[in-house]
């Protein structure tokens, strides 16, 4: 991508922008043909506001907006109930998806998506490549799933809250540092993504267990050492679904 030391890449979670715009604004249609455009309008306003706010010494040298390709990804092949509880996208939002891609390109910003992969996957891949090339990365998103990427050379920025999220910010949210976020999520589950986890184990308890045992594999290997009977039982009985 022509990227290296001294460069600063911003990766925008475009799919999150679209849904935020859709739910935040009243319906709007194009007078000429009745095409829904409310989410597109909101998306463009958000993107324009972002561009106005990034001037300064810490401005990015590269920017890309990343989109989900579809509702199906390789994770559905691994776990067929993944996100199965989510309803399909609203009918009036579907025709706006391609329009947001066109709008992104009209802003002269790179627009990326890949079949079989979610925006999160592409953001992770691009972020690691950019970091490994010697540059810095800022992920523009409030998605908690992306917090596991935060570390040396990679930070997050929640544009809605005007808040930067570094390693300490991740610890404040999860009770663990970024490299153990995925372990906490595996234990506590995620109702948004329909990931089961261990029944009765919440984020705080999961963080305590991970901090006590070091990581998820060690916790499951030594689960018989847990003193609380119910907690010990749920980990032993649900070990396989926790590993999902």
Tell me what each language-model feature is.
Residues 2-140, 144-166, 241-243:
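Noncatalytic, basic helical substrate-engagement surface that gates or grips nucleic-acid strands
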């Amino acid at each position: 991508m022509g990227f290296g030391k001294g460069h600063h890449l911003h990766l925008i979670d475009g799919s999150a922008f679209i849904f935020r715009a859709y739910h935040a604004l009243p319906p709007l249609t194009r007078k000429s043909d009745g095409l829904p455009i409310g989410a597109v309008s909101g998306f463009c306003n958000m993107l324009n506001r972002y561009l106005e706010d990034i001037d300064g010494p810490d401005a990015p040298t590269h920017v890309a907006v990343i989109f989900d390709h579809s509702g199906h990804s390789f994770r559905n092949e691994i776990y067929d109930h993944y996100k199965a509880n989510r309803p399909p996208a609203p009918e009036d939002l579907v025709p706006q998806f391609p329009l947001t891609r066109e709008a992104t390109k009209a802003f002269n910003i790179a627009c990326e998506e890949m079949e079989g992969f979610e925006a999160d996957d592409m953001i992770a891949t691009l972020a690691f490549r950019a970091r490994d090339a010697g540059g810095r990365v800022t992920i523009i998103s409030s998605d908690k799933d992306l917090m596991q990427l935060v570390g040396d050379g990679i930070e997050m920025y929640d544009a809605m809250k005007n808040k930067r999220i570094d390693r300490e910010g991740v610890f404040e949210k999860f009770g663990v540092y970024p490299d153990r976020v995925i372990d906490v999520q595996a234990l506590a589950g995620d109702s948004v993504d329909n990931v089961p986890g261990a029944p009765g184990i919440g984020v705080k308890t999961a963080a305590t267990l991970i901090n006590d045992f070091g990581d998820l594999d060690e916790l499951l290997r030594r689960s018989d050492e847990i003193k609380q009977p119910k907690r010990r039982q749920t980990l032993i009985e649900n070990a396989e679904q926790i590993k999902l």
